[in-house]
Amino acid sequence: MTKLIIHLVSDSSVQTAKYTANSALAQFTSVKPKLYHWPMIRNLELLNEVLSKIEYKHGIVLYTIADQELRKTLTKFCYELKIPCISVIGKIIKEMSVFSGIEIEKEQNYNYKFDKTYFDTLNAIDYAIRHDDGQMLNELSEADIILIGPSRTSKTPTSVFLAYNGLKAANIPYVYNCPFPDFIEKDIDQLVVGLVINPNRLIEIREARLNLLQINENKSYTDFNIVQKECLEVRKICDQRNWPVIDVSTRSIEETAALIMRIYYNRKNKYNK
């Protein structure tokens, strides 16, 4: 496989550059990437340390840096080394400025903007944690999204991922032969999404979990017939109420969350017309 070195340079957490790089790398199956992360680069001293690393290991540079002088230093250095140096959001900012007729602000402020979006995200994360695994069902009316599904169908990480996108998500497990919360009999406004998975895949995940916890007694947890019935019952519950169902067998958490968000915003846009 072809090796590819990528330096991610940022004056903050480097996540924007990282997500961009990984999205691009997904298009190259024959590439073996090596990503170097350089976060919180906010002065020339720190940047010079990074430049020495880049000089030692040549590769593509992706950056998100607000300070103009630091950007100039970085791009000039890469130009002299004849290596690509790409601003992840530079072109986007420029096009926004041209289209809107608004000048790019010259003053740079490294303090995070504690706006409504920031606090909405914090509240959503807190909500996801407090309403994980069927907890505090009396507060489901506060949720934007409710996830239901058998154990180990990625309900918790999906809820947290949704929370990082500002959406309050509660999740409720479905356990075979156990009564399901009576909220499903009520007319609710929240988006309810069922998560199911291929039974064989779910058994593999559950067995790995039990081995990790060194538990051998819970045979029904990995019994194929029971696992299959759990998934079928979740589908039945959702189908009867016109709730969407997502099969997570081959989906990453990010993909599952993205699909849920698409359903959520399509639904919201429809009702807001």
Swiss-Prot record:
HAMAP family registered for this protein in UniProt: PDRP
Family of this protein: Belongs to the pyruvate, phosphate/water dikinase regulatory protein family. PDRP subfamily.
Enzyme Commission (EC) number: 2.7.11.32, 2.7.4.27
Enzyme class: transferase
Chain sites annotated for binding ADP: 149-156
PANTHER family: PYRUVATE, PHOSPHATE DIKINASE REGULATORY PROTEIN 1, CHLOROPLASTIC (PTHR31756:SF3)
A GO term, aspect molecular function: phosphotransferase activity, phosphate group as acceptor
InterPro entries with a match to the protein in the record: Kinase-pyrophosphorylase, PPDK_reg
Its job: Bifunctional serine/threonine kinase and phosphorylase involved in the regulation of the pyruvate, phosphate dikinase (PPDK) by catalyzing its phosphorylation/dephosphorylation.
Catalytic reaction equation(s): N(tele)-phospho-L-histidyl/L-threonyl-[pyruvate, phosphate dikinase] + ADP = N(tele)-phospho-L-histidyl/O-phospho-L-threonyl-[pyruvate, phosphate dikinase] + AMP + H(+); N(tele)-phospho-L-histidyl/O-phospho-L-threonyl-[pyruvate, phosphate dikinase] + phosphate + H(+) = N(tele)-phospho-L-histidyl/L-threonyl-[pyruvate, phosphate dikinase] + diphosphate
Protein known as: Putative pyruvate, phosphate dikinase regulatory protein
Domain of life assignment: Bacteria
Alphabetic keyword roster: Kinase, Nucleotide-binding, Serine/threonine-protein kinase, Transferase
Transmembrane parts of this sequence: none
Record-linked NCBIfam families: PRK05339.1
Species: Rickettsia conorii (strain ATCC VR-613 / Malish 7)
